[in-house]
Swiss-Prot record:
Transmembrane stretches, start-end: 12-37, 60-86, 108-133, 161-184, 212-238, 266-284
Keywords assigned: Membrane, Mitochondrion, Mitochondrion inner membrane, Repeat, Transmembrane, Transmembrane helix, Transport
GO biological process, one term: glycine import into mitochondrion
Name the record gives this protein: Mitochondrial glycine transporter
The protein's role, per its UniProt record: Mitochondrial glycine transporter that imports glycine into the mitochondrial matrix. Plays an important role in providing glycine for the first enzymatic step in heme biosynthesis, the condensation of glycine with succinyl-CoA to produce 5-aminolevulinate (ALA) in the mitochondrial matrix.
Gene3D superfamilies associated with the record: Mitochondrial carrier domain
Solcar repeat start-end pairs: 6-85, 102-186, 208-291
GO terms for MF: glycine transmembrane transporter activity
Organism encoding this protein: Eremothecium gossypii (strain ATCC 10895 / CBS 109.51 / FGSC 9923 / NRRL Y-1056) (Yeast)
Pfam families in the cross-refs: Mito_carr
A cellular-component GO term for this protein: mitochondrial inner membrane
Amino acid sequence: MSEKAGGVPAHLVSGFFGGLASVCALQPLDLLKTRLQQAQASSLRSVLREVRTTRELWRGTLPSALRTSIGSALYLSLLNYSRSALARGSEARTRSSLLPRLQSYQNLLTGALSRAAVGLVTMPITVIKVRYESTLYAYNGLAEATRHIWRSEGARGFFKGAAATTLRDAPYAGLYVLLYEQAKEMLPRALPATLLGADESGKLTAPASAMVNGVSAFLSASLATTLTAPFDTIKTRMQLQSHPVGFVQTLRHIVCEERARTLFDGLSLRLCRKAMSACIAWGIYEELLKLLH
């Protein structure tokens, strides 16, 4: 692994705290998105009216925090390991980052494969999180949710929607890493020099690199989220069912019984959450990496 990018512990710690910060700040958006997707007749206004207290907006924060912080730590460590292996012998870096620079197809593949692998590992937490956030299950805690799924559906219940999740997360992550790395190269050239500060070696200062990385993350996440939105709706519907429902069956039901537009339910909320989450998580990740290096 490239020494410039730090060792595995640095990526684990940086990814963990980046993911944790983003989920604590943005959990209300995730909860509203889940409830908006669970029923075809819902509107954001009606979902908000059903929220009884402000505290309820943070329902499911614990499983979300576990999934996102652990998932981010594992994903970013695996992503860096695979990218560093492909970049071995190369010293190419962008001005705002310690991460290795790869060709576009390599960014696409490493992002997609790393996310698919970590997504399967964290799938049980994801299922519990979605059930906990919805209004269809009145769980009083994670232990109760875990026992109920195990007793009623068995081990298979913890991996419900795995195919839809992989079809959503792998393309999203691949597109995101590709776009993110390109944006980090383009933004310093596109922005006025007065907005950017650099040291004697040409590397951007901490405030400038944080701005470039944050804006790059926001823009990349916005586009990747829009393109993969239908898979998110299908995944949520599958995970909320107590009986086995397939990917194709769920897709056919939404398109034929409801309307194709339903596939994009919750997009505005997911767009806000994913874009801001990427901005927070990747911004913290990249800057913590420099401090720990």
